[in-house]
Amino acid sequence: MPSTKVAALSAVLALASTVAGHGFVQNIVIDGKSYSGYLVNQFPYESNPPAVIGWATTATDLGFVAPSEYTNADIICHKNATPGALSAPVAAGGTVELQWTTWPDSHHGPVISYLANCNGNCSTVDKTKLNFVKIDQGGLIDDTTPPGTWASDKLIAANNSWTVTIPSTIAPGNYVLRHEIIALHSAGNADGAQNYPQCINLEITGSGTAAPSGTAGEKLYTSTDPGILVNIYQSFGAANGAVATGSATAVATTAAASATATPTTLVTSVAPASSTSATAVVTTVAPAVTDVVTVTDVVTVTTVITTTVL
């Protein structure tokens, strides 16, 4: 085989290997029932793909959204995303297990989840009208040996799955759950972070009243956020705001050095304290509130603590 063909074949195989390493949410489990995600490696090639709760995308290369695209609608639910035709019921306070395809262990980074109220039918919602509030975040777990142990590593260890608890205080309605991994292995370079957003439709039931206004998807991040432009082999800053009070992941502040970020996340009214505790990535401290307030982040993460969930 001529050397030029060998070189071309090597390049193709290298690209295929890289692409194959990236993932997407293929299945969702709620109250013991399984729901298919949007199978981007299968459905786009079918003449009549099934209706699912996952949002369709054109990211057939299993690629990512780069920081240079953060003001583009693709950051909301991935490339050219369109709403899922179905919604899955879940009670406020219930859990949603998101099962990814195999995630590469080299792609270290946080795992973050948001909710946005569709204020109507999620199957026809305009994604640019959605406003997201963060309900769950995992980041740096152990920085003893750089690049450290990350939420992505925890996801891999859990058979490539991540479980999100729906806030017990959230008002009932139709919501989009935006769930993503941000790979930071190349984030020391400008435009090097890699966002892999995934969206599913939920019908949340319950008697909660919390209705935080949230943040538009195109305003969740900037390309120079401390948690986006960062060398994980040296330091880390949390990507975007705090987790809403009442969520499964609570947050607190402890940092040897810190920087502030633009407030983007809202905190809902607090629920009565429970005895449940969860491991929290150190990102911010939210004051006790009785209404919706804005929180300014402390973004440098240096430790992991255990705190009581409200």
UniProtKB/Swiss-Prot annotation:
In this chain, Cu(2+) is annotated as bound at H22, H107, Y196
User: Which positions form S-S bridges?
Assistant: C77-C199, C118-C122
What is the required cofactor set for this protein? Cu(2+)
Location in the cell reads:
Secreted
Give the CC-aspect GO terms: extracellular region
What residue stretch is flagged as signal peptide? 1-21
Q: Which reaction does it catalyse?
A: [(1->4)-beta-D-glucosyl]n+m + reduced acceptor + O2 = 4-dehydro-beta-D-glucosyl-[(1->4)-beta-D-glucosyl]n-1 + [(1->4)-beta-D-glucosyl]m + acceptor + H2O
Which residues carry a glycan?
Answer: N121, N159
Cofactor binding, per record:
Binds 1 copper ion per subunit.
Give the matching InterPro entries.
AA9, AA9_LPMO
Q: Which GO terms describe its molecular function?
A: metal ion binding; monooxygenase activity
Q: Which UniProt keywords apply?
A: Carbohydrate metabolism, Cellulose degradation, Copper, Disulfide bond, Glycoprotein, Metal-binding, Monooxygenase, Oxidoreductase, Polysaccharide degradation, Secreted, Signal
E.C. numbers = 1.14.99.56
Q: Where does O2 bind?
A: H185
Provide the biotechnology use note: Lignocellulose is the most abundant polymeric composite on Earth and is a recalcitrant but promising renewable substrate for industrial biotechnology applications. Together with cellobiose dehydrogenases (CDHs) an enzymatic system capable of oxidative cellulose cleavage is formed, which increases the efficiency of cellulases and put LPMOs at focus of biofuel research.
Q: Which one GO biological process term can you cite for this protein?
A: cellulose catabolic process
Question: What CDD domains does the entry give?
Answer: LPMO_AA9
Activity under varying temperature: Optimum temperature is 40 to 45 degrees Celsius.
Q: Which family does it belong to?
A: Belongs to the polysaccharide monooxygenase AA9 family.
What does the function comment of this entry state? Lytic polysaccharide monooxygenase (LPMO) that depolymerizes crystalline and amorphous polysaccharides via the oxidation of scissile alpha- or beta-(1-4)-glycosidic bonds, yielding C1, C4 as well as C6 oxidation products. Catalysis by LPMOs requires the reduction of the active-site copper from Cu(II) to Cu(I) by a reducing agent and H(2)O(2) or O(2) as a cosubstrate. Active on cellulose, but not on xylan, starch, or chitin.
Full protein name: AA9 family lytic polysaccharide monooxygenase A
Instruction: Tell me which species this is from.
Output: Talaromyces pinophilus
